[in-house]
């Protein structure tokens, strides 16, 4: 049997064989959405006399709520079946994403959703920024649960508080030396002598004048000199004692020099 004219967009029942209809019906049972109508055998004795007919347009099977399918190249054929309905919060799984069970979690992702880690060569430029001096390596941020990363951070990252504590311990170890070592005692010994308070040039000059007039001062004169020079009586007394010892030494050296 044959039909004349173009057969595009037309269904010619005479070109289809109905011998295997019972076999196909047994393999693919009819569903509720598309019931298979039983075709009586008496209605199709010969279909050559019937003209070709066209079906009316059917309603759309897929609703408009389906998510957009990413555009693909028309050169390569990509067979795919019907996709399930996607929720509003679900993510598309692209070819450059790999699902990992222990990937790093991000705040923008839902808590119960699946996480995807980037491939190692996704950002080659950023790997050079993290050098060995930072204490962090690129794989540490790719794999591992959040708890493992928190436990791993104190081991790899140096803390300023830890460095300060180590420095204080080192100083304490230096201070705690052997007390029986005389060298250590001499190094850490502190002088108990009071800081020396030198006299000014004006005070020294006035004391020298007073010493030329009298090598020994009375109590009243010592009080008057201390009040004029803004000194204490003890300071004036000590200065005169030292000056007398110096004069005695100078006289002795002079006598020895004359005798020699």
Swiss-Prot record:
Sorted keywords for this record are:
Developmental protein, DNA-binding, Homeobox, Nucleus, Phosphoprotein, Transcription, Transcription regulation
> What Pfam families does the record point to?
Homeodomain, Hox9_act
GO process annotations (BP): anterior/posterior pattern specification; DNA-templated transcription; embryonic skeletal system development; embryonic skeletal system morphogenesis
Q: Does the keyword Amino-acid biosynthesis apply?
A: no
| Signal sequence coordinates | none
Q: Quote the subcellular location field of this record.
A: Nucleus
Instruction: Write out the GO MF terms.
Output: DNA-binding transcription factor activity, RNA polymerase II-specific; sequence-specific double-stranded DNA binding
Listed PROSITE patterns: HOMEOBOX_1, HOMEOBOX_2
Q: Which GO terms describe its cellular component?
A: aggresome; nucleoplasm; transcription repressor complex
Quaternary assembly: Interacts with Geminin/GMNN, which inhibits transcriptional activity.
Per the entry, what this protein does is:
Sequence-specific transcription factor which is part of a developmental regulatory system that provides cells with specific positional identities on the anterior-posterior axis.
What name is this protein filed under? Homeobox protein Hox-C9
